[in-house]
């Protein structure tokens, strides 16, 4: 481990999280890469998994494996109780009013597509406007592009400040009487910017518009209440918040969901079927056709329990501190470009940067050789990259198990990359 620390490290304080205890809960963090300790800084792509969640998956298949909602035998009843129990766990976690407002999907992408298909095709008319930010992940852009083309609607993009925050002055002008939908990220996966969702939602609702929030980056890191945000839809994924892959959540207001037609058709989403027509099930099951991802949904509940035990305020406190420290260390590199808000309290634990004359992919490979996992590329945000006038960035992203020491290890590797590439001189 590096032994030379900056003055910022000497004065930095860790949050109340017991990071070493937390790290012991994550088996993969004990792995070495080519003899080097794994430093996992790609949490915006997916988080690592605690042993309690992994054990929950194993226990399900060893003790409870059965289909849900359809059997009267003990295994099916127990599996159904666990599955629906997770729905209630999710409801409490995001402050929803009723568990029937929680729809399980395959991920954030499917959740947003569900709204675009089921709500959008019913409600968006020619001449309507769909308002987005320039920071949107392709998953919260491409579905609206397709819908706008089909319905002859128009996409409108909010402005950003030089610091990568939403320009609220022009937002009040761009969200207007033609706005039918505001689809906005809770937190940028490139800039780390935390969006003022409630303020934007109020502007949209004054115009009679509906508000959808892409919470893929926000929900795992911020205390989230759909009531406080005052939105109509929230989409997020469990794999970014300690859960397994293949599980997403769509929350929507009950009255809006009730008015929407199903997204997919088949078993379990019906109440009765005749030869000529069918009657659809009630919420939430009318949006959950077929056998669901039972085991992973149940294990997702265990992941939420883990976060609840830590406390989301404490999770946020830790990320602010480690992000502030990372920003201060990265600034030591002469010529480095760091994207997004300078104030760590206005951003999440996502830090994108570029070093002069070093391609992000080359940098990512050099860091990988040092056992450090980051992301390099456009991060599924090509329009934003065009606005930033770059092809891509390097991105380090932090979570509950990352430490100041790992930031120092990142810095040591970046300095080594500087030497290897012969480009950047440190101050």
What positions do the PLM features span?
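Pyridoxal 5′-phosphate
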Residues: 3-427
């Amino acid at each position: 481990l590096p032994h030379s620390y900056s003055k910022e490290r000497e004065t930095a304080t860790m949050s109340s999280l017991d990071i070493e205890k937390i790290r012991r809960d994550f088996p993969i963090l004990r792995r070495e890469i080519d003899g080097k300790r794994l430093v996992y800084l790609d949490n915006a792509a997916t988080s690592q998994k605690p042993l309690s969640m992994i054990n929950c998956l194993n226990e399900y298949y060893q003790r409870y494996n059965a289909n849900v909602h359809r059997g009267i035998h003990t295994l099916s009843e127990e599996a159904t109780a666990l599955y629906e129990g997770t729905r209630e766990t999710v409801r409490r976690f995001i402050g929803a009013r009723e568990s029937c407002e929680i729809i399980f999907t395959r991920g954030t992408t499917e959740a947003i597509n569900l709204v675009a298909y089921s709500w959008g095709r019913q409600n968006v008319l020619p001449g309507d406007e769909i308002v987005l930010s320039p920071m949107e992940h392709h998953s919260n852009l491409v579905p609206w592009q397709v819908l706008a083309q089909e319905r002859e609607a128009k996409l409108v993009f909010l402005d950003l400040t030089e610091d990568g925050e939403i320009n609220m002055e022009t937002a009040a002008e761009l969200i207007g009487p033609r706005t039918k939908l505001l689809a906005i990220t809770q937190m940028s996966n490139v800039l780390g910017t935390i969006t003022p969702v409630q303020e934007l939602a109020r502007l949209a609702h004054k115009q009679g518009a509906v508000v959808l929030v892409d919470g893929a980056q926000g929900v795992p890191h911020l205390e989230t209440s759909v009531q406080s945000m005052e939105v109509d839809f929230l989409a997020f994924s469990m794999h970014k918040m300690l859960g397994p892959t293949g599980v997403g959540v769509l929350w929507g207001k009950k009255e809006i969901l009730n008015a929407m037609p199903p997204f997919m058709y088949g078993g379990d989403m019906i109440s009765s079927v005749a030869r000529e027509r069918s009657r659809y099930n009630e919420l939430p099951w009318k949006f959950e056709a077929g056998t669901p991802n039972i085991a992973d949904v149940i294990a997702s509940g265990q992941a939420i329990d883990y976060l609840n035990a830590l406390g989301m305020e404490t999770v946020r406190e830790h990320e602010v501190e480690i992000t502030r420290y990372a920003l201060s260390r990265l600034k030591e590199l002469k010529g480095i470009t760091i994207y997004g808000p300078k104030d760590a309290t206005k951003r999440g634990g996502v830090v994108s940067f570029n070093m002069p004359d070093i391609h992000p992919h080359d940098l990512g490979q050099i860091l990988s050789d040092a056992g450090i996992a980051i992301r390099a590329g456009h991060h599924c945000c090509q329009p934003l990259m065009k606005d930033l006038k770059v092809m891509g960035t390097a991105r380090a992203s932090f979570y509950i198990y990352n430490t100041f020491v790992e930031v120092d290890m990142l810095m040591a590797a970046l300095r080594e990359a500087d030497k290897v590439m012969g480009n950047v001189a440190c101050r």
